[in-house]
Structures are given as C-alpha cells and as structure tokens.
Amino acid sequence: MSIEKAHRMRAIKCPTDELSLTNKAIVNVSDFTEEVKYVDISPGPGLHYIFALEKISGPELPLGHVGFSLVQRKWATLSINQEIDVRPYRFDASADIITLVSFETDFLQKKTTTQEPYDSDEMAKEFLMQFAGMPLTVGQTLVFQFKDKKFLGLAVKTLEAVDPRTVGDSLPKTRNVRFGRILGNTVVQFEKAENSVLNLQGRSKGKIVRQSIINPDWDFGKMGIGGLDKEFNAIFRRAFASRVFPPELVEQLGIKHVKGILLYGPPGTGKTLMARQIGTMLNAREPKIVNGPQILDKYVGESEANIRRLFAEAEEEEKRLGPNSGLHIIIFDEIDAICKARGSVAGNSGVHDTVVNQLLAKIDGVEQLNNILVIGMTNRRDMIDEALLRPGRLEVQMEISLPNEQGRVQILNIHTKRMRDFNKIASDVDNNEIAAKTKNFSGAELEGLVRAAQSTAMNRLIKADSKVHVDPEAMEKLRVTRADFLHALDNDIKPAFGAAQEMLENLLARGIINWGPPVTELLEDGMLSVQQAKATESSGLVSVLIEGAPNSGKSALAANLAQLSDFPFVKVCSPEDMVGFTESAKCLHIRKIFDDAYRSTLSCIVVDNVERLLDYGPIGPRYSNLTLQALLVLLKKQPPKGRKLLILCTSSRRDVLEEMEMLSAFTSVLHVSNLSTPENVLAVLDDSDLFSPEELQSIARKMAGKRLCIGIKKLLALIDMIRQSEPHQRVIKFLSKMEEEGGLEMDRVQGH
C-alpha cells in the first residue's frame, strides 16, 4: 500500500550500467529515509508501477531525480526528464506471497546471441540470490546477467500467489495475481520466448508441475508414508509455518525460525522416510543428506571441517542476501554417532566432543544462520548431548512411535497398492483384518510381512526337483492370498516390540491345572490387576508380586496372566538371560526391557525369580545392591503419558524382599499356595490320565487324614517319573515317593 504523500520528481537515465542491472529505481540517499524500500511510480492518472529502491550518494544523481534504465522506461512508459509522482510503498502482512513466477526469456540484444546452454536450475538459484524481495508485476521486463554470459531479458508472464492469512486453513489455494513480491523460496521458471534461439536446459525450463512451498494438505498415500499424519502436521506447524511469511513481518514479530528437528523412535518406524519428504515438501534447495558416521575422519580436524563444509553454502548466501536467503536443509541420519553426550566417549582424542561443539556453533553460535534447517534422526535419543536439544538448536523433538491400527492400515494400503492395481492380490485379503492382527508392528516390519506373503505365493508356482521349474502360467496364476499373509505372520515376521511368545510357552509348557479354589482366586485377583492396568482412569502403572514356596507354579501363573492380558508387548526378564553378567550390564539389560516397554501403548513385563536377579545367597547373606536399586526405581517409575505398563514379578522368598524393603514398591501381592488336601492332589492326578478310577480311589483311601504339602511343579515331575514305572506298581511307588519328597506324612493324625 502507498504511504505518505507523493513526491514530485523527474525521471532521468540510470547513472551507470552496473546500477541498471539491479532493476531498481535509483534515487539520492537524501530523498528518502532508510525505512523506505519500495516506491509507487505514477507517470499519469491511473498508472502505477511498483519499484524497489537503490539509494546512492554523489553528484551523479541530483536530489529530486529518479534514475531508470532503458528497459524500465519502456515498461513504465517514461521519457527522460518527465515529471512523475513518487510515493513510498510498503507491503503489509496481508500482501500476497509469490510462490511461483514464470518468465518469458530471451537475449536482451537480439543481434548478439549464442547457442551456449543456459542451466535453468542454476539460473533460478542465481535469480533468487540477486532479486529476493523484489516486487514484480505481470508484463514487467528485467535485465538478468547470468555468470559471464550474454545479458537476458526476462518478461514476467505469470505470478502465482497465496494469501498468508490462509496458510493455517486445511486447503490454502494458490491463485494468479497481477503483482507481488518474491521470496527466497519462490519457484522460478523460465520459458523460451517465441522464435528465440536461447538454449535452455534443466528442470526449471518451461511449465513444470511442482509442489508449492506451502502445502499443509500433504498426501501421505502418494508419498509412501502411512500412519504419521499427526506428526507431520505438528512438524509443519512448529518448523515451517513461520517461513512462509515475508521477512519484514517476521522481523516485526521478532520471530526466530526453528533451526532444528529431532526425529526419534524405534527402528523401522519411518524417520528417514519422513525427513526425505520434509525436504521435498518445502520445495527448497535439494536437501543435503548425511549419514552420521560419514562425518568422522581419521585426520585431526577433518571431522570438524566436514561439519563446516555442510554449512558453507548457507553461510555464503546469508552474507549476500540476509533475510531474503532461501532455506537450506541438512539431514543427519544416525545423528547419535556424532553427537554423543560430551565426556561420555572413552579416549583422549576428544573428537566426538569437538564435533558436537562445532555443530552447536554452526546452528546457534555467535554468527548464527537463519536460513538453515537441520533434521536429525536417531533411535537413541538418550545418547545425544543435552545442549543440542535445547531451544535454538534441535528444539522440535518428535517421537515417531509404532503405528496404531489406523496407521497400519495406511501402511499396508501403500505396500499392497501395486498388487491391487495389477490384480495380483486375492479378494479375501482384508488390510483391516491384517492390521488388527499385527499389533506393535513397525512400518518396516509391515513391509517385510508383505514381502514374505509375496514369496510364499511365488513359491507355490516353483517346482524344485533336480532343476528349478517355474510354472509357465505364473503371470496369470499368481495371487497373494489371505493364507499367505497368515503364514508369514505365524512363521516369518515377528515384531521387535511384540510378545515373547516362545518364552511364555516355555513357562507354560504344562499349562495351568486348576486343582482347587486357591488357583481360581489367584487367577481372578490377577485378572483384576490386568483390568486395572488397562483402565483409562488408572495411573498407568500396576506392579504385582506373585510369591509362594518353591515349585508352586508362580512363573506359569505369571505367564498365563501375561497371555490372558492380550497386551501387544510382553517381555520376560529372566535371570537365565543374564548368567555371567556384571552388575552394571545386568542393570542396563533390565533398563532396556523397560525402555522398550515404554514405547508401546500397552505393555507387560514378567520379572521372573526376583531373588535370583538380585544375586541373593542365604549364606552371608549376599545380594546385589546396584540391581536392587535399579529394580526399585523402575518398579515405581511411571510410564510416559498415554502408556500403560503391567509388571508381574515372581519370588520364592517374600521374607527376603520384605527385609530389602521391596514389598512397598508393588501395587499388590498375591500368594501361591501348595497343594494341601487329598482332593487337591486327586484333581491333578485325574487331569494327568495316569491312574484308573479304582487306583485313584485306592490313593484317596491311603491319603485320607494325612498331612499334605507339595508344590504343583514337584507333583507334576513326580507324575512324569511314575509314568515310566510298571502299571501294577504305580500306586505304591507314588505314595512312597510322596513320603520321600516330604509331601505326605504317613503318620495318621489323631482326632481330638
């Protein structure tokens, strides 16, 4: 909009050829204040032309005069010494942002032409470097010098713009406008003028379809990303929304652009894929993608120099153009390789520390850059130096977690799209059903599942005898069916954050035998704890201690509760996996299991045989205090918001845990009883199918009135041993073994 009243001035020739290449109106520095950067030139009623100003001092441009080049005078229909009205002009916050400008391009002087190729991509970069912030009007002609080649004449053909007030809308649309201002990220296209001999090359030549810089309505299906809609939109809001506004408005608001994003989460969830799409979404310069370990070098100082080289181009452009500089994106994959916490890496070279220091200085140092965006990716956020994570550095930290069911459907749709397009997938395959069965699968594991199903389908059409033969009608016959997916799910692909089915099945090798009311009550109480852990109103953490005498079946009951919970993530923390571990290694192993559990929405951890985990020995007594303190902390630590964790611990020494003040860490304690009545034992014997009804009656008569106490595990082992003896000796053998094992007292209890 025009501001202040008009100055009556006189149009003259541009003082020098160099100034004419700026395509600006040249005025004396005393004619306008420093704040005035644009002017509205009016040579007559109803005629208005917007120019950028270049202020110079010296006698070559007298006060009250405006210098125009020949090209500018032709466009604005100005004659030398013509009086014109000149008003200061300011672009306000609602001014259109030019997202695309198309030029009709030809040699400025038709007599001096060349067949030398002009790289349109390099021309677009150079144009933005020279003219970012320049107002353009449809029909305006500019003089453009590209490197040391012939001068070009650029006539503005079309301008596409978006209103910055609509950026937050779900569908901001671009529209053609008459004039506006270009920014450092405007897409520049060059179209060869009719009958021109100009040799244009590159992607910025002619009309090409390219994404606008502002595109919040990102189509994840086409880009090959599924299940990350919320994360992608959050990143756009935090990191990119401020970059679509004019530099002057950003300066007035005092905004500092976000310079860094950290994407972290389990392996295979799409962090690298997402970073790649962020680069293409912005339509900025081609992002620089660097693997963390590539930065490290064997020569002293080279690692730091590699960091400096990544930022060199952005530094040069920042010095030349200041706030009008375009955006430079640098993507670090596996950033934990170079940004470990300082002082944590052994050795006296300190290479890792100096690399972190160099990166900190470049992102947010004394001479800070405002035209960069650093995207780091890692699955070990805990290893990264905390100074790198504060605001001003990698301040937007987005967890790319395991996809939910809706996200898994999107991912499966992406990976089965081509099969559906070419009718290579059977009609019985339902992605919604597969998504429901693949709890806690990452995106990479779902892709692996599709590949495994395809290989199963292809294998049906291969006949392998002495030679390998492929069915000649394979092209027509090949269909991937639901059975192929289920086979891959059962046999080929297991999620890294899924249930530890094999370990649970080992603990439940004999199943659960309901030998009496104590078992029923314990399972009911255990299921109440499971429901408590699942409940939305619960605190998110439920820990249960299942204690009882040795061989009473505690581990099997804990495994059974873990299976009945139907939690997608179930892990067993067993002393068997930590034989020979040092105390610190044991603590790290336990902590990793808990850290993995926090990544799943519903998790269950079975901590088997707690006293063995603590290295408890009764002679001494001796135990590992380091492991004890680690367990106490983890048993009480609340999982992240929105996550639920059920911890099932087993122990044969309640008295020891009480002395260690560990019982208070549990939400509830369940006691597992031994078998204590003849009816209990007979229920187990009946379930074993070892004795005939008559033999069971004989055993019942012999045990009547006797004192009993035996663990279910020991009783089952005894039954397995008796099974190997002669049938006619089994009853006598069983009773004698029961007495030997101390489970049965043969002295009759005298009644009172």
Swiss-Prot record:
| CDD domains (UniProt xref) | RecA-like_NSF-SEC18_r1-like
**Gene behind this chain?**
Nsf2
The family annotation for this protein states: Belongs to the AAA ATPase family.
> What's the catalysed reaction?
ATP + H2O = ADP + phosphate + H(+)
Which PROSITE patterns does the record cross-reference, listed alphabetically?
A: AAA
Q: List the protein's name.
A: Vesicle-fusing ATPase 2
Expressed, tissue-wise, as follows:
Nervous system and secretory tissues.
Quote the record's cofactor note. Binds 1 Mg(2+) ion per subunit.
**Record's function text:** Required for vesicle-mediated transport. Catalyzes the fusion of transport vesicles within the Golgi cisternae. Is also required for transport from the endoplasmic reticulum to the Golgi stack. Seems to function as a fusion protein required for the delivery of cargo proteins to all compartments of the Golgi stack independent of vesicle origin.
TM stretches of this protein: none
Q: Which UniProt keywords apply?
A: ATP-binding, Cytoplasm, ER-Golgi transport, Hydrolase, Magnesium, Metal-binding, Nucleotide-binding, Protein transport, Repeat, Transport
Where does the chain bind ATP? 510-515, 550-557
Q: Which cofactors, if any, are listed as required? A: Mg(2+)
The places in or outside the cell where this protein is found are: Cytoplasm
- What are the EC numbers? 3.6.4.6
- What GO annotations for molecular function exist for this entry? ATP binding; ATP hydrolysis activity; metal ion binding
Instruction: Tell me the InterPro entries matching this sequence.
Output: AAA+_ATPase, AAA_lid_3, Asp_de-COase-like_dom_sf, ATPase_AAA_core, ATPase_AAA_CS, Cdc48_dom2, CDC48_domain_2-like_sf, CDC4_N-term_subdom
What domain of life does the UniProt record list for this protein's source? Eukaryota
Q: Which GO terms describe its biological process?
A: Golgi to plasma membrane protein transport; intra-Golgi vesicle-mediated transport; liquid clearance, open tracheal system; neuromuscular synaptic transmission; neurotransmitter secretion; open tracheal system development; regulation of synaptic assembly at neuromuscular junction; SNARE complex disassembly
Q: Name the SMART domains for this protein.
A: AAA (SM00382), CDC48_2 (SM01072), CDC48_N (SM01073)
- Stored Pfam families: AAA, AAA_lid_3, CDC48_2, CDC48_N, NSF_ATPase_lid
Mention any one GO cellular component term assigned to this protein in its UniProt record: Golgi stack
Subunit and interaction comment:
Homohexamer.
